[in-house]
Amino acid sequence: IIARSLNEIAKKMCAKGKGILAADESTGTIAKRFKSINVENIEKNRLNFRQTLFNSSAMKDFIGGVILFDETIRQKTTLGPSIPELISKHGAVPGIKVDKGAKPLAGSSDETVTEGLDGLRERLKEYYELGARFTKWRAVYKISDKFPSAQSIKSNAHALARYAALVQEAKMVPIVEPEVLMDGSHNIDKCYQVTTNVLNECYNELEIHKVDLKGTVLKPNMIIPCLLYTSPSPRDRQ
């Protein structure tokens, strides 16, 4: 029953013609956006901005899910319902980013591993009670002559799988986001090779951790040459 429910949520999030809205800007990030339009960065203004966004007519037609920030999922609208209730009213699924960010990977000079597993089971229980029905966790990989290392690929895949298993245990759908960054000087073939290795390792770990893939959503990077690559091959131009 739980597996069927998770699959239905995942399908609703990714319904044809709809996308997932990333509205999980941190307080610091939204401050920069407000500054550009001379709006004070206070909770009232942040609530009004998001409430206006989630009340728009486009929500029903184009949005299948909304990723929220911790502050936002706890807020109530000026009309009474909570933000998650408002999102659900418009036919979208409320979700929450749960990772704690990419931190330096011990044993590697310039790579990261995403943290946030400590206390995650308890946080997931609270987020479910607040109305979340899916979550997001992002791992990042950089490409260079030395990177990503096997250590980085394995460490991040293991963390993603542990996260996904905990999320499904909490009756929510995990978005699995292993992102190979565009930074560097690599071509499209290198991006393809690294992304393939990263995804293979992620799905190996998901299987080991008994994650039901039908109750997950994959958020992959695009296969493209990096930002600094200057000698495109015929394949790069396609």
Task: Pin down the residues of each PLM region.
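Alpha/beta catalytic barrel-like cores
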Residues: 1-130, 143, 231
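Alpha/beta enzyme core
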Residues: 123-130, 134, 163, 169-170, ...
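Conserved, mostly hydrophobic/aromatic
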Residues: 42, 137, 176, 218
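Alpha-helix N-cap and loop-to-helix initiation/capping positions
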Residues: 41, 112-119, 148-159, 186-198, ...
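A glycine-rich phosphate/pyrophosphate-binding beta-strand-loop-alpha-helix module
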Residues: 129-149
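Active-site-proximal loop/turn and secondary-structure-junction residues that shape catalytic pockets
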Residues: 25-27, 70-72, 100-102, 139-145, ...
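Conserved small/polar residues in nucleotide/adenosyl-binding loops
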Residues: 229-238
